[in-house]
């Protein structure tokens, strides 16, 4: 299991991702016109454009120029449709009418959610942000020494250093004791082997 600082960093990264996802959803699926920056505030954040469908690009200001790859020429007109519309392209007074008022929105942009769905998802996103923020607060509260002053923490560090030295000295004593016991055990085993089989040289001489 990761330590507290690693968990805290992970939660902060997740919170930033949730903020980004929340802003992206609110900017894309609302049914209102984008907010206009106040003219008297030069550093106001610009309005975000809606995110096209199946796009992984981050939100951009609504007034930003369209990228070069998306500035394609208008689609070729259907010959049959063009021929049919040729007779009606000129209105009274020789003026060409503008685009039809009933023309739909950009098909690449997702349709806005219904007010009920939008409000429900707003609450869900807000709840997720609150839960993640509470997790971060809990991890901060359990950090060691969070309620101690700098002097108290330095004193505690010195105490731990002294305790570590004592433990290291005990470990060295145990290691020396272990080596002594191992030599004693080897001598006992050698004596037992000699007592059972006698002197090997004598056995080999008279065998």
UniProtKB/Swiss-Prot annotation:
The UniProt keywords, alphabetically, are:
Activator, Coiled coil, Nucleus, Transcription, Transcription regulation
Keyword Nucleotidyltransferase included in the entry's annotation: no
Leader peptide range in chain numbering: none
List this protein's GO terms for biological process: regulation of transcription by RNA polymerase II
The molecular function terms of the Gene Ontology recorded here are: transcription coregulator activity
Q: What's an example GO cellular component term for this entry?
A: mediator complex
**Name listed for the protein in its UniProt record:** Mediator of RNA polymerase II transcription subunit 21
Look up the coiled coil feature and give its residue ranges: 146-196
């Amino acid at each position: 299991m990761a330590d507290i600082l690693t968990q805290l960093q992970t939660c902060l990264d997740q919170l930033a991702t949730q903020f980004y996802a929340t802003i992206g959803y609110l900017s894309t699926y609302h049914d209102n016109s984008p907010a206009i920056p106040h003219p008297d505030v030069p550093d106001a954040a610009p309005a975000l454009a809606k995110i096209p469908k199946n796009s992984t690009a981050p939100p951009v200001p609504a007034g930003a120029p369209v990228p070069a790859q998306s500035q394609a020429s208008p689609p070729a007109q259907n010959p049959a449709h063009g021929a049919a519309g040729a007779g009606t392209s000129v209105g009274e007074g020789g003026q060409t009418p503008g685009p039809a008022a009933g023309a739909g929105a950009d098909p690449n942009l997702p349709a806005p959610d219904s007010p009920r769905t939008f409000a429900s998802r707003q609450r869900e996103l807000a709840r997720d942000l609150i839960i993640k923020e509470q997790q971060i607060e809990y991890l901060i509260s359990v950090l060691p020494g969070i309620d101690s002053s700098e002097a108290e923490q330095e004193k505690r560090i010195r105490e731990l250093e002294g305790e570590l030295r004592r433990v290291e000295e005990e470990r060295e004593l145990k290691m020396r004791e272990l080596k002594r016991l191992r030599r004693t055990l080897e001598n006992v085993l050698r004596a037992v082997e000699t007592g059972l089989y006698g002197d090997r040289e004598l056995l080999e001489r008279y065998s």
